[in-house]
Swiss-Prot record:
Residues 56-69, 322-335 have a biased composition (Polar residues). Belongs to the SWT1 family. Signal peptide: none annotated. InterPro entries: PIN-like_dom_sf, PIN_dom, SWT1_Regulator. It comes from Mus musculus (Mouse). This is Transcriptional protein SWT1. SMART domains: PINc. Residues 395-522 form the PINc domain. Residues 30-75, 308-340 are annotated as: Disordered.
Length: 907
């Protein structure tokens, strides 16, 4: 199609050149004839002639209006034709112009059609040629329309010039005779000229607006038309895509403004009025071309409107998008958090609705699913087949909600406990317990226990996620099954049903229900399920580690257990001892948290009310309810403002030590940590007892801590029997240990107690050294600090404080040197001499006398070595503080002329 159109364009240009040459020859011949008739020739006339030829050539080449220009020059040269111009000559010339143009154009159009037809037969198919000729006809239509308009303007312009020439000619007689008729004709001509000028100007403006841009150059019209034609051809859309285009702009076609439709109609009428003056054949071709151009213009307008619509919509969307991001980041973050809260609220409400419906559990699943539910509990190793289950002995402990929330630490220790006489100890979490924890976490059951429900949920989730074989969960299928026709009236019945189901699933295992609910324990005992509280279970675990009494299970006996499970192979002695020690240590910590928490809460409330009055709750760092860790955090936070004013500042070290050891005990319980906790608690209570008894709370707590210390000493000796003792003697001693603990016997049976007491006395000397250094350094700092308003310092003068600071720095340096030598990896007996010489030199405690060997034995113990490490770190911090204080007052001391050798003692 491109080849057809290009060849057609080339042929059109060739015929245009031939047509122009012929018209120029004819005009030259007519001019030669007129020159022969003329008698006078002037150089001015020759110049006008040349200008006329140039203008005629340009106009004829562009628009084909050569005859008008030649006739015009003939009127200027011939004076005899002026009288008859208006009557005959004018009409004949108009006819000549109108007839001349269509003849030439008809020949041109027929030639182009013939050439295009030949080219189509030789080069391409008929369809391709038809498309090419159609495009060329559209272009010719546009060019002829513009040419007709320009011809109309040239005619009007020629009329004006002719009338002016007629007025300028000196013919007096004709003017006088024909004056009235000429005057009337003149007026009519002027009116017609004005009307034609207005019409032509309006038509030209409309054409320019519709077809041509502003400041358009007519000389480049042909080039631009061909270039635009090439662009249209190269981007021509196939017929299939035209349907999609119509679908895209179908709604836009019917939304065009009425003003646009009117302008289209006016343009169409104007084009048709100009085309009616042409020949019939030309008229038909032009009408067809105008229809095609009109359709193309409409399509172009539709595309433009569609593009504008897309542009405006995209711009609007961009503006809206930009406006949405004009808000500050804080509002965006707040909106994001609000959206997240709303989403979480929806999820929680939906979950709460499901939880509410899940109380009424579904009907029993079909037969055959019960055996598959064994797979849901744990994997094959943890849940063997039914045949292999009969030979397994497990201790299955069903945990109630209150135990998980109030004694989670005990549950964690219990999960890691090895019980002799059983293959494994497994914790069972009923389905209803998980539901209750979930609702408590959301605050729907008990709002004040949310902080306890969340850790329990995390513990269960982490254990199941890590596939811990010692924690199972009751599946939904098992919970939905009815047992003995029992209807689940409340959650207690569902927990009890879980115990009965696991008794059936594992008949050779012991199932224990652990709950603090007395009524639920009663139901369990009536139903044949062994039910214990947390305290009772703690004692029972110790009994099971020693006796392995399974009399509550009718299907198993002690002889079968001893025959099936050899204790030497399945339950080692060390494992049983460690399990018993962990349980006892955990019990001691729980008792300490209860009694010490009661005492510290009373102290905190009393001292805060004295300091702040009724506003003490607003000032308080952590609001109740408190744990022991929370109370210690409050003491640390308010020490300077409240407790440091009424107590010694060195007591803060004891509070910090309590806090660190308690955090350590929550992660892993060991004997040394528990012992440090009890000793620090005793020191703290003794210090506060000098101020007040706090309504009798401190004496009771002090007595309970002493009992726990005694029990700890018993545990240390009784759980480490000698290798020569038999297993039976060990079991008897462990049984007596449990009885002693249960009866709170305040008697020490440890034969090594005097040595332990000796070590405590030696350590008390080291503690007194630390307390003396701490108190003296505090007095020095207060005296040297000019901004301090406290007057509790015993040092009166600035000079005395400075001298005392130098002595303290030397003492701390010596103590650190001795402690660091003891804490060295390859330390021996000789390394303790430095510290021992310092203690003897300063005679810190004259009442306590000990040797270097006894000091070495004391610091060689693990617990005292750990304490010594903590003390070394605290002494290093104090040494740095002393150096900073000495450097800050050095210039002032030097200006006062104090002894230089004293200043040289600074490290």
């Amino acid at each position: 199609m491109l080849l057809c159109t290009t060849s057609a364009h080339k042929l059109e240009t060739v015929y245009d050149h031939k047509f122009l040459k012929m018209s120029i020859k004819e005009s030259c011949a007519k001019e030669e004839k007129s020159q022969k008739k003329q008698t006078i020739s002037s150089p001015t006339f020759n110049e006008d002639k040349k200008k006329g030829e140039i203008s005629a050539g340009s106009t004829s080449s562009e628009h084909g209006v050569q005859p008008v220009s030649t006739k015009k020059r003939k009127l200027k040269a011939d004076d005899t034709d002026n009288v008859y111009y208006n009557a005959n000559r004018k009409n004949s010339k108009r006819l000549n112009v109108e007839v001349f143009i269509p003849k030439k154009r008809l020949k041109f159009s027929s030639s182009t059609q013939a050439v295009s037809y030949l080219n189509n037969n030789q080069m391409t198919s008929h369809s391709c040629s038809s498309n090419g000729t159609k495009d060329t006809k559209v272009k010719d239509c546009k060019l002829t329309n513009i040419g007709s308009k320009l011809n109309y303007e040239i005619k009007n312009h020629s009329r004006i010039k002719i009338t002016k020439d007629m007025k300028s000619k000196p013919v007096d007689q004709t003017k006088e005779k024909n004056w009235p008729s000429l005057l009337i004709q003149k007026k009519m001509k002027e009116l017609k000229k004005e009307k034609n000028n207005k019409d032509s100007s309006e038509e030209l403006e409309k054409c320019k607006k519709n077809h041509l841009p502003q400041n358009y150059n007519f000389s480049n019209m042909i080039k631009e038309s061909f270039e635009s034609g090439r662009k249209k051809i190269s981007f021509k859309i196939p017929k299939k895509s035209s349907t999609t285009l119509q679908k895209l702009v179908e709604e836009k076609i019917f939304t065009i403004d009425s003003s646009k439709s009117k302008s289209k109609q006016e343009e169409k009428q104007h084009l048709q009025s100009h085309q009616m003056s042409l020949n019939l054949a030309r008229h038909k071709t032009e009408n067809s071309f105008s229809d095609s151009t009109h359709k193309q213009s409409v399509c172009e307008r539709i595309r433009k409107d569609h593009c504008e619509h897309q542009g405006t919509s995209s711009s609007d969307s961009k503006e809206n998008h930009a406006q949405s991001f004009e808000t500050p980041c804080s509002s965006v973050s707040s909106e994001d958090t609000q959206d997240a809260d709303e989403e979480m609220q929806i999820v929680e409400e939906l979950h709460a609705a499901r939880v509410g419906r899940s109380v009424d559990l579904p009907v029993v699943p079909p037969s055959g699913e019960l055996m598959s539910m064994e797979i849901d509990l744990v994997d094959e190793d943890a849940h063997p087949s039914a045949a292999h289950t009969a030979s397994d002995t497990k201790l299955l402990i069903v945990m109630d909600t209150n135990v998980l929330m109030n004694h989670l630490k005990f549950v964690k220790i219990l999960k890691t406990t090895e019980i002799p006489g059983f293959d494994t100890l497994v914790l069972i979490i009923p389905w209803v317990v998980i539901q209750e924890l979930d609702r408590m976490k959301a605050g729907k059951l008990l709002k004040h226990v949310q902080h306890k429900a969340v850790p329990a949920i995390h513990f269960i989730n982490n254990s199941l996620k890590s596939q811990d074989r010692k924690l199972w969960g009751q599946s939904l299928q098992l919970a939905s099954q009815k047992l003995y026709g029992l209807s689940d009236e409340n959650n207690d019945d569902r927990v009890l049903k879980c115990c009965l189901q696991y008794q059936q699933l594992f008949p050779c295992s012991l199932v224990i229900l652990c709950t603090d609910d007395r009524n639920l324990r009663t139901k369990g005992l009536i139903s044949g399920v062994k039910s214990l509280s947390k305290e009772d279970l703690d004692t029972e675990i110790l009994n099971l580690t020693l006796n392995t009494d399974l009399c509550h299970q009718p299907c198993i006996s002690k002889q079968q257990l001893n025959a099936e499970v050899p204790p030497a192979k399945e339950t080692p002695k060390e494992g049983a001892a460690n399990s018993g020690l962990s349980i006892l240590l955990e019990r001691i910590i729980c008792d300490l948290e209860k009694c010490l928490g009661t005492a510290l809460s009373s102290i905190l409330e009393t001292e805060m009310k004295i300091a702040f009055g009724n506003l003490w709750m607003e000032v308080l760092y952590l609001k109740p309810p408190w744990t022991l860790i929370n109370l210690l955090q409050c003491f640390k936070k308010h020490w300077l403002a409240v407790f440091g004013l009424v107590m010694e500042n060195n007591l803060l070290v004891t509070v910090e030590s309590l806090y660190e050891n308690l955090c350590k005990a929550n992660k892993a319980v060991d004997f040394t940590t528990v012992k440090f906790l009890l000793q620090d608690s005793k020191s703290l209570l003794h210090a506060f007892s000098t101020r007040s008894n706090y309504d009798g709370v401190l004496p009771q707590t002090f007595a309970q801590v002493n009992k726990l210390l005694q029990v700890l000493a018993e545990v240390k000796t009784k759980l480490k029997p000698s290798s020569s003792e038999s297993t039976r003697s060990k079991e008897q001693e462990d049984t007596s240990l449990v009885k002693l603990h249960n009866q709170d016997v305040n008697v020490f049976l440890d034969s090594n107690l005097p040595q332990a007491t000796r070590h405590q006395e030696i350590w008390s000397v080291l503690e007194s050294v630390w307390m003396s250094i701490y108190q003296n350094s505090t007095d020095v700092f207060q005296t040297l600090d000019s901004s301090s308003t406290l007057t509790t310092s015993k040092i009166a003068s600035f000079e005395e404080a400075f001298v005392y600071l130098q002595k303290l720095m030397v003492a701390v340096k010596d103590i650190l040197e001795g402690i660091q030598r003891i804490l060295a990896p390859n330390s021996n007996y000789q390394d303790v001499e430095t510290l021992y010489n310092f203690l003897i030199k300063y005679e810190v405690n004259k009442n306590v006398k000990f040797t270097a060997r006894e000091l070495y034995d004391c610091v060689s113990q693990t617990e005292y070595r750990e304490r010594l490490t903590i003390g070394c770190r605290q002494l290093i911090e104090m040494e740095c503080t002393m150096q900073q204080c000495s450097a800050s007052v050095y210039m002032e001391a030097r200006s006062r002329g104090w002894c230089e050798d004293m200043l040289n003692n600074r490290p």
